[in-house]
Amino acid sequence: MSQISAADVKNLRDITGAGMMDCKKALDETGGDMQQAIDFLRKKGAALAAKRADREAHEGMIQVKLANDCKRGVLLELNCETDFVARGNDFTSFTAALSELALSQCVASAEAMLPLALGAAYDGETVDSAMKTMTGKLGEKINLKRLAFFDMPDGVVEGYIHPGAKLGAIVSLKTDKPELVGELAKDLAMQIAAAAPIVVDRSGVPADYIAKEAEIYRQQALEQGKKEEFVDKIVTGRLEKYYQDVVLTEQVFIKDDKLKVSAMLDQFRKKNQATLDVVGFVRYQLGE
Protein backbone atom coordinates (compact mmCIF):
# COMPACT_ATOMS: atom_id res chain seq x y z
CA MET A 1 0.00 0.00 0.00
CA SER A 2 1.37 3.44 -0.95
CA GLN A 3 2.19 5.83 1.82
CA ILE A 4 -0.40 8.56 2.29
CA SER A 5 1.07 12.03 2.76
CA ALA A 6 -0.48 14.89 4.68
CA ALA A 7 -0.49 16.86 1.41
CA ASP A 8 -2.61 14.16 -0.25
CA VAL A 9 -5.09 14.25 2.61
CA LYS A 10 -5.29 18.04 2.44
CA ASN A 11 -5.73 17.94 -1.33
CA LEU A 12 -8.60 15.47 -1.04
CA ARG A 13 -10.20 17.56 1.66
CA ASP A 14 -9.93 20.69 -0.52
CA ILE A 15 -11.60 18.85 -3.39
CA THR A 16 -14.42 17.18 -1.45
CA GLY A 17 -14.84 19.19 1.74
CA ALA A 18 -14.90 15.94 3.73
CA GLY A 19 -13.29 15.68 7.18
CA MET A 20 -9.56 14.98 7.53
CA MET A 21 -10.08 11.52 9.05
CA ASP A 22 -12.58 10.59 6.33
CA CYS A 23 -10.11 11.71 3.67
CA LYS A 24 -7.28 9.72 5.28
CA LYS A 25 -9.47 6.61 5.40
CA ALA A 26 -10.58 7.06 1.78
CA LEU A 27 -6.97 7.29 0.60
CA ASP A 28 -5.98 4.29 2.71
CA GLU A 29 -8.86 2.24 1.30
CA THR A 30 -7.99 3.14 -2.31
CA GLY A 31 -4.22 2.85 -2.16
CA GLY A 32 -3.72 6.59 -2.47
CA ASP A 33 -5.58 6.90 -5.78
CA MET A 34 -7.13 10.37 -5.67
CA GLN A 35 -10.03 9.73 -8.09
CA GLN A 36 -10.91 6.44 -6.42
CA ALA A 37 -10.80 8.20 -3.05
CA ILE A 38 -13.23 10.84 -4.33
CA ASP A 39 -15.56 8.06 -5.55
CA PHE A 40 -15.17 6.30 -2.19
CA LEU A 41 -16.31 9.42 -0.34
CA ARG A 42 -19.25 9.87 -2.73
CA LYS A 43 -20.37 6.30 -2.13
CA LYS A 44 -20.03 6.86 1.59
CA GLY A 45 -22.22 9.94 1.20
CA ALA A 46 -24.84 7.92 -0.69
CA ALA A 47 -24.78 5.24 2.00
CA LEU A 48 -25.18 7.84 4.74
CA ALA A 49 -28.00 9.47 2.77
CA ALA A 50 -29.79 6.12 2.65
CA LYS A 51 -29.34 5.69 6.40
CA ARG A 52 -30.67 9.18 7.07
CA ALA A 53 -33.56 8.99 4.58
CA ASP A 54 -36.11 8.71 7.38
CA ARG A 55 -34.61 11.51 9.47
CA GLU A 56 -36.52 14.75 9.95
CA ALA A 57 -35.08 17.69 8.01
CA HIS A 58 -37.01 20.83 8.94
CA GLU A 59 -34.16 23.36 9.01
CA GLY A 60 -32.55 24.86 5.93
CA MET A 61 -33.23 27.95 3.85
CA ILE A 62 -35.57 29.55 1.37
CA GLN A 63 -33.91 30.95 -1.77
CA VAL A 64 -35.20 33.16 -4.58
CA LYS A 65 -33.39 33.63 -7.89
CA LEU A 66 -34.54 36.07 -10.59
CA ALA A 67 -33.48 36.51 -14.22
CA ASN A 68 -31.66 39.78 -14.92
CA ASP A 69 -34.68 41.10 -16.82
CA CYS A 70 -37.10 39.95 -14.07
CA LYS A 71 -39.14 37.94 -16.57
CA ARG A 72 -38.46 34.61 -14.85
CA GLY A 73 -37.89 33.55 -11.27
CA VAL A 74 -37.49 30.58 -8.95
CA LEU A 75 -38.36 30.08 -5.30
CA LEU A 76 -37.12 26.94 -3.56
CA GLU A 77 -36.71 25.35 -0.14
CA LEU A 78 -33.68 23.22 0.67
CA ASN A 79 -33.77 21.35 3.98
CA CYS A 80 -31.20 20.03 6.42
CA GLU A 81 -31.46 18.89 10.05
CA THR A 82 -29.89 21.74 12.05
CA ASP A 83 -29.66 25.51 11.87
CA PHE A 84 -25.88 25.21 12.31
CA VAL A 85 -25.52 23.41 8.97
CA ALA A 86 -28.09 25.71 7.32
CA ARG A 87 -25.92 28.74 8.10
CA GLY A 88 -22.71 27.17 6.80
CA ASN A 89 -21.07 28.15 3.53
CA ASP A 90 -21.34 24.65 2.03
CA PHE A 91 -25.11 24.56 2.45
CA THR A 92 -25.77 28.14 1.35
CA SER A 93 -23.54 27.74 -1.71
CA PHE A 94 -25.32 24.52 -2.65
CA THR A 95 -28.70 26.23 -2.30
CA ALA A 96 -27.53 29.05 -4.57
CA ALA A 97 -26.26 26.54 -7.15
CA LEU A 98 -29.62 24.76 -7.17
CA SER A 99 -31.55 27.99 -7.66
CA GLU A 100 -29.28 29.05 -10.52
CA LEU A 101 -29.70 25.67 -12.21
CA ALA A 102 -33.48 25.73 -11.78
CA LEU A 103 -33.69 29.21 -13.28
CA SER A 104 -31.40 28.47 -16.23
CA GLN A 105 -33.29 25.27 -17.08
CA CYS A 106 -36.79 26.65 -16.36
CA VAL A 107 -37.50 23.80 -13.95
CA ALA A 108 -41.04 23.66 -12.60
CA SER A 109 -40.72 21.17 -9.71
CA ALA A 110 -38.29 19.67 -7.21
CA GLU A 111 -38.70 16.24 -8.82
CA ALA A 112 -37.70 17.60 -12.24
CA MET A 113 -34.46 18.90 -10.72
CA LEU A 114 -33.14 15.53 -9.57
CA PRO A 115 -31.68 14.21 -12.88
CA LEU A 116 -30.16 17.55 -13.94
CA ALA A 117 -26.38 18.00 -13.84
CA LEU A 118 -24.74 20.68 -11.73
CA GLY A 119 -21.65 22.58 -12.87
CA ALA A 120 -17.94 22.00 -12.40
CA ALA A 121 -18.06 23.12 -8.75
CA TYR A 122 -19.98 19.89 -8.08
CA ASP A 123 -18.07 17.77 -10.61
CA GLY A 124 -21.07 17.59 -12.91
CA GLU A 125 -23.03 15.41 -10.51
CA THR A 126 -26.79 15.25 -10.86
CA VAL A 127 -28.79 17.10 -8.23
CA ASP A 128 -29.89 13.78 -6.74
CA SER A 129 -26.32 12.51 -6.49
CA ALA A 130 -24.99 15.85 -5.23
CA MET A 131 -27.53 15.89 -2.39
CA LYS A 132 -26.25 12.48 -1.30
CA THR A 133 -22.68 13.73 -1.53
CA MET A 134 -23.62 16.76 0.58
CA THR A 135 -25.31 14.46 3.10
CA GLY A 136 -22.05 12.54 3.45
CA LYS A 137 -20.01 15.73 3.67
CA LEU A 138 -22.21 17.53 6.21
CA GLY A 139 -23.47 14.51 8.14
CA GLU A 140 -27.12 15.55 7.80
CA LYS A 141 -30.01 14.70 5.52
CA ILE A 142 -30.12 17.22 2.65
CA ASN A 143 -33.40 17.42 0.77
CA LEU A 144 -34.82 19.70 -1.93
CA LYS A 145 -38.35 19.94 -0.55
CA ARG A 146 -40.13 22.13 -3.08
CA LEU A 147 -39.68 24.57 -5.92
CA ALA A 148 -41.82 27.09 -7.81
CA PHE A 149 -40.98 28.59 -11.20
CA PHE A 150 -42.62 31.64 -12.81
CA ASP A 151 -42.25 32.85 -16.39
CA MET A 152 -43.90 36.16 -17.29
CA PRO A 153 -42.75 37.50 -20.70
CA ASP A 154 -45.54 40.12 -20.64
CA GLY A 155 -44.71 41.48 -17.22
CA VAL A 156 -42.35 40.96 -14.31
CA VAL A 157 -41.46 38.38 -11.69
CA GLU A 158 -40.20 39.57 -8.31
CA GLY A 159 -39.30 37.92 -5.03
CA TYR A 160 -38.55 38.59 -1.39
CA ILE A 161 -36.58 36.67 1.22
CA HIS A 162 -37.02 37.67 4.84
CA PRO A 163 -33.77 38.10 6.83
CA GLY A 164 -32.71 34.69 8.08
CA ALA A 165 -33.89 32.98 4.87
CA LYS A 166 -36.68 31.07 6.62
CA LEU A 167 -39.50 32.84 4.80
CA GLY A 168 -39.86 33.94 1.20
CA ALA A 169 -42.28 34.72 -1.61
CA ILE A 170 -42.38 35.14 -5.36
CA VAL A 171 -45.02 36.95 -7.41
CA SER A 172 -45.75 37.38 -11.12
CA LEU A 173 -47.43 40.47 -12.57
CA LYS A 174 -48.76 41.08 -16.07
CA THR A 175 -48.39 44.68 -17.25
CA ASP A 176 -47.82 46.78 -20.35
CA LYS A 177 -45.30 48.93 -18.48
CA PRO A 178 -42.89 46.47 -16.83
CA GLU A 179 -40.20 49.14 -16.55
CA LEU A 180 -42.33 50.94 -13.94
CA VAL A 181 -43.44 47.99 -11.83
CA GLY A 182 -40.21 46.99 -10.07
CA GLU A 183 -40.74 48.63 -6.67
CA LEU A 184 -44.42 47.75 -6.56
CA ALA A 185 -43.62 44.11 -7.36
CA LYS A 186 -41.07 44.01 -4.53
CA ASP A 187 -43.66 45.48 -2.15
CA LEU A 188 -46.17 42.81 -3.19
CA ALA A 189 -43.65 40.02 -2.64
CA MET A 190 -42.99 41.41 0.84
CA GLN A 191 -46.74 41.68 1.46
CA ILE A 192 -47.22 38.03 0.51
CA ALA A 193 -44.38 36.89 2.77
CA ALA A 194 -45.60 38.94 5.74
CA ALA A 195 -49.39 38.59 5.48
CA ALA A 196 -49.65 35.04 4.08
CA PRO A 197 -52.56 35.39 1.64
CA ILE A 198 -53.85 32.23 -0.02
CA VAL A 199 -55.40 33.56 -3.24
CA VAL A 200 -55.12 36.68 -5.42
CA ASP A 201 -58.81 37.67 -5.32
CA ARG A 202 -62.18 36.37 -4.13
CA SER A 203 -62.71 34.33 -7.27
CA GLY A 204 -59.87 32.09 -6.13
CA VAL A 205 -61.76 30.92 -3.04
CA PRO A 206 -63.88 27.84 -3.92
CA ALA A 207 -67.63 28.50 -3.62
CA ASP A 208 -68.24 25.25 -1.73
CA TYR A 209 -65.64 26.27 0.85
CA ILE A 210 -67.32 29.64 1.38
CA ALA A 211 -70.70 27.92 1.75
CA LYS A 212 -69.22 25.60 4.36
CA GLU A 213 -67.61 28.48 6.27
CA ALA A 214 -70.87 30.45 6.16
CA GLU A 215 -72.77 27.52 7.64
CA ILE A 216 -70.21 27.17 10.43
CA TYR A 217 -70.48 30.90 11.24
CA ARG A 218 -74.30 30.63 11.18
CA GLN A 219 -74.34 27.73 13.64
CA GLN A 220 -71.87 29.51 15.92
CA ALA A 221 -74.05 32.63 15.97
CA LEU A 222 -77.18 30.64 16.76
CA GLU A 223 -75.42 28.69 19.53
CA GLN A 224 -74.30 32.02 21.01
CA GLY A 225 -77.94 33.02 21.28
CA LYS A 226 -77.94 35.61 18.50
CA LYS A 227 -81.37 36.52 17.17
CA GLU A 228 -82.28 34.98 13.82
CA GLU A 229 -82.78 38.38 12.16
CA PHE A 230 -79.15 39.33 12.97
CA VAL A 231 -77.51 36.06 11.97
CA ASP A 232 -77.13 36.81 8.26
CA LYS A 233 -75.41 40.11 9.02
CA ILE A 234 -73.06 38.36 11.47
CA VAL A 235 -72.22 35.69 8.88
CA THR A 236 -71.54 38.35 6.23
CA GLY A 237 -69.26 40.24 8.61
CA ARG A 238 -67.26 37.14 9.49
CA LEU A 239 -66.88 36.20 5.84
CA GLU A 240 -65.61 39.70 5.08
CA LYS A 241 -63.01 39.29 7.84
CA TYR A 242 -62.02 35.94 6.33
CA TYR A 243 -61.57 37.52 2.90
CA GLN A 244 -59.41 40.27 4.41
CA ASP A 245 -57.17 37.61 5.92
CA VAL A 246 -56.67 35.27 2.96
CA VAL A 247 -57.27 37.31 -0.22
CA LEU A 248 -54.24 39.34 -1.34
CA THR A 249 -56.18 42.20 -2.93
CA GLU A 250 -58.41 42.55 0.16
CA GLN A 251 -55.54 42.77 2.64
CA VAL A 252 -54.37 46.03 4.19
CA PHE A 253 -51.23 47.15 2.37
CA ILE A 254 -48.23 46.70 4.67
CA LYS A 255 -46.71 50.06 3.67
CA ASP A 256 -49.90 52.08 4.13
CA ASP A 257 -52.56 50.86 6.57
CA LYS A 258 -55.10 53.26 5.06
CA LEU A 259 -55.03 51.36 1.76
CA LYS A 260 -56.08 47.91 0.68
CA VAL A 261 -53.80 46.18 -1.80
CA SER A 262 -56.52 46.54 -4.45
CA ALA A 263 -56.55 50.32 -3.95
CA MET A 264 -52.77 50.48 -4.16
CA LEU A 265 -52.91 48.61 -7.48
CA ASP A 266 -55.62 50.95 -8.77
CA GLN A 267 -53.53 53.98 -7.85
CA PHE A 268 -50.62 52.62 -9.85
CA ARG A 269 -52.84 51.92 -12.88
CA LYS A 270 -54.30 55.44 -12.88
CA LYS A 271 -51.06 57.27 -12.19
CA ASN A 272 -49.14 55.44 -14.93
CA GLN A 273 -51.97 54.77 -17.39
CA ALA A 274 -50.93 51.14 -17.20
CA THR A 275 -52.49 47.71 -17.20
CA LEU A 276 -51.55 45.64 -14.16
CA ASP A 277 -52.74 42.26 -12.91
CA VAL A 278 -51.40 39.90 -10.26
CA VAL A 279 -51.17 36.57 -12.09
CA GLY A 280 -49.97 34.38 -9.25
CA PHE A 281 -47.74 33.97 -6.23
CA VAL A 282 -46.13 31.37 -3.99
CA ARG A 283 -45.09 31.74 -0.35
CA TYR A 284 -42.76 29.32 1.46
CA GLN A 285 -42.11 29.22 5.19
CA LEU A 286 -39.38 26.87 6.35
CA GLY A 287 -40.64 23.55 7.65
CA GLU A 288 -44.29 23.98 6.65
UniProtKB/Swiss-Prot annotation:
SUPFAM superfamilies: Elongation factor Ts (EF-Ts), dimerisation domain, UBA-like. GO terms for cellular component: cytoplasm. Residues 82-85 are annotated as: Involved in Mg(2+) ion dislocation from EF-Tu. Keywords: Cytoplasm, Elongation factor, Protein biosynthesis. PROSITE patterns: EF_TS_1, EF_TS_2. It holds the Pfam family EF_TS. GO terms for molecular function: translation elongation factor activity. It is found in: Cytoplasm. Belongs to the EF-Ts family. Associates with the EF-Tu.GDP complex and induces the exchange of GDP to GTP. It remains bound to the aminoacyl-tRNA.EF-Tu.GTP complex up to the GTP hydrolysis stage on the ribosome. This is Elongation factor Ts. It comes from Chlorobium chlorochromatii (strain CaD3). The lineage of its organism: Bacteria, Pseudomonadati, Chlorobiota, Chlorobiia, Chlorobiales.
